[in-house]
Amino acid sequence: MAVRLTKNELKRQKETLKTFRRFLPTLQLKKQQLYAEIRAVEARASEVRSRADALRQDVQQWVAVFSESGVFDARLLRVQEVKKTYASIAGVRIPCFLEVHFACPPYDLYRVPLWVDTAVRKMQEVLSLDLEAHVLDEQALLLGAELRTTTQRVNLFEKVKIPETRACIRKITVYLGDQQVAAVVRGKMSKKNLVDVSRMEQEDTR
């Protein structure tokens, strides 16, 4: 796109450069914040999964008992609702895990072995941790998408917009400087011509 080599355009380009320089630090700070948040979310997800894996190992004995006794009912682990809230991090709306409700049907305590309550509770804890880790994965995905967009904007400002604007300013400044020098030269030449004409007229009158 051609740039108008005028004083007004020079002023406009300088204002544009000032705007870019004002917004760039904000974008860079947002990029750093998003990166730190993603690392923190990934660390929390890893910690939650470690707890779930440890508990899952403990649950394996109950799974074996369920299989042998035939008392296992899949409805005991049916998820009724996953309660979430939402928060804003660096302008990104992300889900936050609160709790999970299970639709556990009532069962006859006299007919079901005593260990069923403990086994169901532990297995529900595992599922709850798995669901929490899933929500943390959602957070990381949303923050990651925003980080990519912000990084693209930072690169656009740093590598394209600011260098282009500086180049335009230099081009206009050089052109206007050349025009000013040319105007001074023309002025001096005009003055010299006037002096020469005046001298010649004086010589003719003698």
Curated annotation (Swiss-Prot):
Pfam family, one: ATP-synt_D
Keyword Transport: yes
NCBIfam families linked: PRK02195.1, V_ATPase_subD
Record's protein name: V-type ATP synthase subunit D 1
Lineage per the UniProt record: Bacteria, Pseudomonadati, Spirochaetota, Spirochaetia, Spirochaetales
InterPro entries assigned: V_ATPase_D (IPR002699)
Keyword entries, A-Z: ATP synthesis, Hydrogen ion transport, Ion transport, Transport
Naturally occurring in which organism (per UniProt): Treponema pallidum (strain Nichols)
Entry similarity comment: Belongs to the V-ATPase D subunit family.
Record function comment: Produces ATP from ADP in the presence of a proton gradient across the membrane.
A Gene Ontology BP annotation from the UniProt entry: proton motive force-driven plasma membrane ATP synthesis
GO molecular function: ATP binding; proton-transporting ATP synthase activity, rotational mechanism; proton-transporting ATPase activity, rotational mechanism
Disulfide links within the chain: none
